């Protein structure tokens, strides 16, 4: 970070499963507009984006991150099978699948080994599985930290770091504005994944149901956090996509999500969005019978 944290900027990347692709479109336009953060903070899927961007914080790095998201398929991250379900039940295993596929993806694509080696100061949020306490990882092996932050409880195994068992950072703090604020940063740009506000039918699988419900809870919590910290810091929230009918469990539409988010973010920037500190209407409870004003 810069020597004067009160004049520095943090990018905060939220969790959101496959909707993390939306943040990449937002990031593309923020960087193209000249935004350069002094540090990055991320949780869950947002930890993947934060870690990758921290290693290559420029337009080429964003393009490479977008290409990565476009290659990802659900089986690359969550390789579910009947065999894995049977193994969980018969062996009394506390998780559905091993995290080998996710770990391999991270090892192949992150261009550095330790958090301290990133080009930007990087802070990854995870959750202590025993007490729900937020744990901020600002040093140590980056793959372990990101894997811990993305370890959905019950789906992936916890990750042991420093003798503490850690799971998904979204459990404790999915959009870690408070972490950026605690670092002394006074200008925060939030990249929220949003939620599928226009689904026509409920998600079909148990995990899709759970992840969708979590995104709804997260959006409500983000609004409360913005109300809490809005008077204490300069916070700019990039509006998420709305209406959105893509589940956070659906990885087949990442390219479209990136491009659409980039288009909407460019329009928001051109309209003076980075000069405003407002809570986007897309994050609040709404239906699509009414036209959102933001």
For each feature predicted by the language model, list its residue ranges:
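Patatin-like phospholipase
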Residues: 1-43, 48-294
């Amino acid at each position: 970070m810069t020597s004067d944290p009160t004049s520095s900027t943090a990018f905060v990347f939220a969790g959101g499963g496959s909707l993390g692709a939306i943040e990449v479109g937002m990031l593309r336009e923020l960087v193209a507009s000249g935004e350069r953060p002094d540090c990055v903070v991320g949780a869950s899927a947002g930890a993947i984006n934060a870690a990758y961007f921290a290693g290559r914080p420029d337009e080429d790095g964003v393009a490479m991150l977008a290409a990565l998201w476009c290659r990802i398929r659900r089986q690359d991250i969550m390789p579910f099978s009947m065999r894995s379900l049977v193994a969980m039940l018969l062996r009394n295993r506390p998780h559905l699948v091993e995290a080998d596929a996710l770990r391999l993806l991270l090892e192949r694509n992150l261009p550095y080994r330790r958090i301290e080696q990133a080009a930007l100061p990087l802070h990854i949020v995870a959750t202590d599985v025993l007490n729900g306490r937020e744990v901020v990882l600002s040093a140590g092996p980056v793959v372990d930290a990101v894997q811990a932050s993305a370890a959905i409880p019950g789906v992936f195994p916890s990750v042991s770091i420093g003798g503490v068992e850690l799971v998904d950072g979204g459990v404790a703090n999915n959009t870690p504005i408070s972490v950026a604020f605690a670092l002394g940063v006074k200008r925060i740009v939030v990249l929220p994944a949003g939620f599928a506000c226009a689904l026509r039918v409920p998600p079909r699988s148990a995990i899709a149901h759970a992840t969708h419900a979590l995104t709804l809870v997260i959006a409500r919590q983000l609004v409360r956090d913005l109300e809490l910290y809005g008077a204490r810091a300069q916070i700019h929230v990039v509006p998420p996509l709305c209406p959105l009918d893509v589940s956070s469990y659906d990885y087949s539409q990442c390219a479209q999500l990136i491009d659409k988010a980039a288009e909407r973010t460019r329009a928001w920037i051109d309209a003076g969005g980075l000069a405003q500190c407002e809570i986007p209407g897309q994050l609040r409870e709404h239906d699509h019978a009414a036209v959102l004003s933001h």
